[in-house]
């Protein structure tokens, strides 16, 4: 009888361990960790964009070009064609899913341009020695994971209203092209700041222990 009990108990343990292994084969990542990773990635990309913009300005742009560019629209930022929240109050009025969709759309609008820009710069510029495209893809995946978590597996990004940054001259031998790329880098920096802000707002709203000084 004891032998039978031991055999049955042993079989039960094996089955329980098997079930635990099956359930834990693909463990879910806590929502806090998903937000923390996304915020960290967005912060890095925004810092990279700001450093690249500053280095490019210092290397290629004259004082006259810099001042004239600030007062003109050499390159129209794609994000200006969509009513993204641009201030603190408007951002807080949007739901987490809306902010995630905005963020995903912004990230996806830059996947092609950064590949073209990456081929232009020499290694003394931040872009030339970075893996910005890969980091954008990682952030895209992180945002999609958050959307899946909040939407129970179904999500759709906003359709592009027009092809973003499809046609721009990256021949740096031309002064006009230099200024256009300068404008693009300015747009990239602004858009990555938006993404970072949106993610921080979402994390702040959901987790009390997060830094909420936004």
UniProtKB/Swiss-Prot annotation:
CDD domains to which the protein is assigned, alphabetical: somatotropin_like
Gene3D superfamilies (UniProt xref): 1.20.1250.10
Principal cellular location given in the protein's record: secreted
A single GO BP: animal organ development
Keyword Disulfide bond: yes
Highest rank taxon of the organism: Eukaryota
Record-linked InterPro entries: 4_helix_cytokine-like_core (IPR009079), Somatotropin (IPR034975), Somatotropin/Prolactin (IPR001400), Somatotropin_CS (IPR018116)
Function according to Swiss-Prot or TrEMBL: Growth hormone plays an important role in growth control.
Name by which UniProt lists this protein: Somatotropin-A
